[in-house]
């Protein structure tokens, strides 16, 4: 209770699995029973193309949480940008009253480890030592490439002429 009050919060929702999934839940979609939400199109691109039912689960549990909590606003991390876009579409397409419209679904910058800039994520906690060492490399390369691109832009180098130097910098 003290930690919640310290951050200006009086309540926290800690639902039990059986409350959220009264018919039970299994990872095998063919065996699932009950109502589920699917956002067609957006859910089947990028990450959804290799995990075809992932966003179905996200959309379903977020819908349930929104129905229980009825938030004025919702906040999602930028590291899961596709998820945030799917949720914005969900909120608009199903005419959610809480939060009322996608303008109240906010995307916040990714929180990163100050040492190596790896995104702080529940999934990243499962990385072994080697994976933990390698994981920040992509973000470092992207930031380096962005720096080169932006530097060339300040020198009025045309976008078409920025590609080669940017790619060379990150290799």
Which residues are covered by each model-predicted region?
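Nucleotidyltransferase catalytic core that binds NTPs
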Residues: 1-171
